[in-house]
From Swiss-Prot:
It comes from Polynucleobacter necessarius subsp. necessarius (strain STIR1). One of its GO terms (cellular component) is proton-transporting ATP synthase complex. F(1)F(0) ATP synthase produces ATP from ADP in the presence of a proton or sodium gradient. F-type ATPases consist of two structural domains, F(1) containing the extramembraneous catalytic core and F(0) containing the membrane proton channel, linked together by a central stalk and a peripheral stalk. During catalysis, ATP synthesis in the catalytic domain of F(1) is coupled via a rotary mechanism of the central stalk subunits to proton translocation. It comes from the Bacteria. It is found in: Cell inner membrane. GO terms for molecular function: proton-transporting ATP synthase activity, rotational mechanism. Belongs to the ATPase delta chain family. F-type ATPases have 2 components, F(1) - the catalytic core - and F(0) - the membrane proton channel. F(1) has five subunits: alpha(3), beta(3), gamma(1), delta(1), epsilon(1). F(0) has three main subunits: a(1), b(2) and c(10-14). The alpha and beta chains form an alternating ring which encloses part of the gamma chain. F(1) is attached to F(0) by a central stalk formed by the gamma and epsilon chains, while a peripheral stalk is formed by the delta and b chains. This is ATP synthase subunit delta.
Amino acid sequence: MADLATIARPYAEALFQSAKPAELAGCLEQLNELAQLAALPEVAALSNNPKVSADDLSKLLSGMVKTKLDPKVASFLNLVNQNHRLVAVPEIAHQFEAMKNKSEGAAEVNITSAFPLEGSALNDLLSSLKKRFGGKELRPTIQVDPTLIGGVRIQVGDEVMDSSVKVQLAQMQASLGA
């Protein structure tokens, strides 16, 4: 089977191009909801069951989401189910979000810290990152990982900046030849 990102890209592009700028946020919200459902083992089992038609699966999933699906998203869901690509929906949602952010001049930022970041420390970090990335609007996701010991690990797109104590210790160990 081809790489999931390769399979997902045309679906994400098609949905992105069919949505108007004002519809992007709503489509993304519904797509993320469908991605969560598609990741459930029970839903995966249904999608692989030859007795369950693509239309039935689409109706079932449409009924499981919180709000009525936008017609574009409903059509997208039918297409995905007809092509037996429900497994790719989480990756499609990820790529759709990246396209939305790019069109809005924004970037997702994953920040992992050894300790909770709050208040002025978080604001200072985001301010520095905003300057570093050309004034883009940053949409942070913050996680705490005590194994970092100290410092932060920041990922924006493909770029990773790791100033954690864990990485510094590993670099010292490598340089000492231990």
